[in-house]
Swiss-Prot record:
One of its GO terms (cellular component) is ribosome. HAMAP family: Ribosomal_bL31_2. GO terms for biological process: translation. The gene is rpmE2. Belongs to the bacterial ribosomal protein bL31 family. Type B subfamily. GO terms for molecular function: structural constituent of ribosome. It comes from Acinetobacter baylyi (strain ATCC 33305 / BD413 / ADP1). This is Large ribosomal subunit protein bL31B.
Length: 82
């Protein structure tokens, strides 16, 4: 393999902010933030969702907050029935 062309593979601290869970995973991601975790300093990346908070993996059932366009239309104009 050629030297100097491959990204640096390192241990990175990922933080799922919804579940407040931390994961140390090998990655080539580049970040300017660092955090100390269990006595070591790691590059730090925040996540909105991971296996610790995703409904598929947690088994939670969530109601979708977005209604379809037809349902929104019907709700808005239901009072104008003939």
């Amino acid at each position: 393999m050629r030297q100097g062309i491959h990204p640096e593979y390192q241990q990175v601290l990922f933080h799922d902010t919804n579940a407040d869970a931390y994961f140390i995973i090998g990655s080539t991601i580049q970040t300017k933030q660092t955090r100390e975790y269990e006595g070591k300093v790691y590059p730090y990346v925040t996540l909105d969702i991971s296996s610790a908070s995703h409904p598929f993996y947690t088994g939670e059932v969530r109601q979708a907050s977005n209604e379809g366009r037809v349902a929104t239309f019907n709700k808005r104009f239901s009072r104008f029935k003939r």
